[in-house]
Design a protein with these regions (language model features):
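Glycine-rich, acidic and aromatic/proline-enriched surface loops and short helix-turn segments
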Residues: 99, 106-110, 123-143
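Short beta-strand-centered interaction patches in the first periplasmic/extracellular domains
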Residues: 100-109, 144-287, 296-299
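An acidic/polar, Gly/Ser/Thr-rich interaction patch typically located in mid-to-C-terminal regions
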Residues: 33-61, 244-464
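Assembly/oligomerization scaffold segments
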Residues: 1-114
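Soluble non-cytosolic domains of exported or imported proteins
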Residues: 120-128, 156-164, 388
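Envelope-exposed proteins and targeting segments
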Residues: 43, 66, 80-82, 99-101, ...
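Second-shell loop/turn segments in exported
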Residues: 56, 114-124, 151-157
């Protein structure tokens, strides 16, 4: 790939000590790598320092918690700024009169999360709880992008850390856009499972949220919205960019910029993992300790597949997966208590006409959120592209990968219609090489992409 599409311009790197005095360390920075991950709550970064006679560690001194500000201009000449805090120092070594070490950085909230404890009891929807925790406990001024949920919940945090509380809510939260069959069993809903006999009912719907930080702020949204391109009820967004795996020779820079420099598949279709986690089918045993009522449900993903958002054009589970879904590969036992937060004298269970404001909705999220989470990263691919600081985790991009067939056949269909298509950015690193063997600073981006199904949206998938 042409170096012209990788160039960036360092502006200033400043470390502010505990008294707020700023030190310009721009000339000592060898490499700055910024990280985001949808499975991690806070952004992080690594900054390689090549310290020649300054001894910043001893003279500032660096004690931890110092504010680091990195200012630069990206490939497009746009101003970019990162504000982080020193978490720790690693890989420190001395060679002649040079010190080499790496500053591990994180967001301010990433450090203060360990001291912020949630003690207040909440009675609200999950997104309202998360919003209050971030604003009034973690004291962040960053924006929260939250999706509206269906059920209210009563939560007593008992002094949990902010992220620990949010994490406990993620898999209990059901999007308001989710559709499922509420209420008691109805005729014709018996499961094909051999477990539990003819009284086993089917569990339906989809559930589960993710919480993470990206360059825009904090995200608390359902996995289905993250996988939605906006054409379904979950109201997601379409791909922000399209990248191609193709030769760069002779191409103008504006086209080279959207080339995939290299890519590698990182595990595809791990059937054993999926079966061990009960992705395709789970047998759920529920016992309400207040009413002494026992029920069994079977979650069959093949029956609820079309209630989810999908990144590919595949419209059903693969044939063998549907066969496996007929018999649960996991059995779970769950205690319910509809009356935990109910003080009335009548029945609390809303399925039996009760009016509890905060019933136990475990039937509607336990198996569903597990299935949604592990289906989400069925296909993984890692790509390297020219630096694009506009990209963030939670975005979707479209990639076009070559059709690995004979050259004559490739002329008719140049791209792989199953492996290509829309992917979710699950993790990324923006890598700024301040010191480079080639001379000028270079910026490249590594992306970890995931998706749940195969196929390009514009074409029918071959999966049957």
């Amino acid at each position: 790939m042409s170096n012209s599409v990788k160039k960036f311009e360092p502006q200033k790197v400043v470390i502010a000590d505990v008294d707020g005095i700023q030190y310009d360390v721009t000339k000592a920075v060898g490499m700055f790598s910024y990280y985001e991950d949808i499975y991690q709550p806070f952004v992080t970064a690594n900054m390689l320092m090549v310290d020649s006679g300054q001894n910043f560690i001893g003279n500032l001194p660096i004690q931890g918690g110092e504010e680091v500000t990195v200012k630069l201009k990206n490939v497009k000449g746009e101003a970019v700024e990162y504000n982080l805090r020193v978490q720790k120092i690693v890989n420190r070594s001395v060679e002649r009169n040079m010190q080499y070490y790496t500053l591990v950085l994180t967001s301010k909230e990433g450090l203060e999360n360990d001291t912020a404890r949630v003690t207040e009891k909440y009675k609200a929807n999950a997104e309202a709880i998360v919003s209050d925790v971030l604003k009034n406990v973690l004291k962040t001024d960053k924006e929260l992008f939250a999706e509206e949920s269906q059920f209210k919940m009563s939560v007593f945090p008992n002094g949990k850390k902010c992220h620990a509380l949010v994490q406990s809510l993620m898999y209990k939260t059901v999007s308001k856009s989710t559709k499922f069959n509420k209420g008691a069993s109805t005729q014709g809903t018996q499961s094909e499972s051999e477990l539990g006999g003819n009284n086993v009912q089917k569990s339906s719907g989809t559930a589960g949220y993710l919480f993470f930080e990206n360059k825009d702020g904090f995200i608390f949204q359902s996995m289905d919205r993250l996988c939605s391109d906006g054409t379904d009820s979950f109201g997601g967004t379409g791909p922000v960019e399209t990248y191609y795996s193709r030769p760069s020779v002779g191409m103008p820079p504006d086209q080279v910029y959207y080339n995939i420099e290299n890519y590698a598949f990182d595990g595809d279709i791990d059937m054993s993992e999926k079966l061990n986690n009960g992705i395709y089918s789970t047998h759920m045993c529920y016992f309400d300790i207040s009413s002494q009522k026992y029920e069994e449900y079977t979650y069959d993903m093949s029956k609820t597949f079309n209630n989810m958002s999908h990144l590919g054009s595949q419209i059903t589970l693969a044939k063998y997966q549907k066969e496996l879904a007929k018999r649960p590969s996991r059995v779970m036992s769950i205690l319910l208590d509809h009356e935990a937060w109910y003080s009335g004298e009548d029945i609390a269970n809303p399925e039996e006409g009760g009016d509890a404001q905060f019933p136990d909705y475990a039937k509607y999220y336990t198996a569903q959120s597990i299935g949604r989470r592990y289906l989400m990263d069925t296909h993984k691919v890692q790509i390297q592209i020219a630096g694009n600081s506009d990209l963030k985790v939670g975005d979707k991009i479209k990639i076009m990968l070559p059709n690995m067939v004979a050259e004559k056949l490739r002329e008719e269909q140049p791209y792989d219609e199953e492996a290509s298509g829309t992917y979710l950015i699950a993790a990324l690193s923006h890598n700024f090489a301040f010191i480079n063997d080639a001379g000028s600073p270079e910026f490249f981006t590594n992306l970890e992409l995931i998706r749940d199904t195969m196929g390009i949206k514009e074409y029918d998938s071959k999966v049957k």
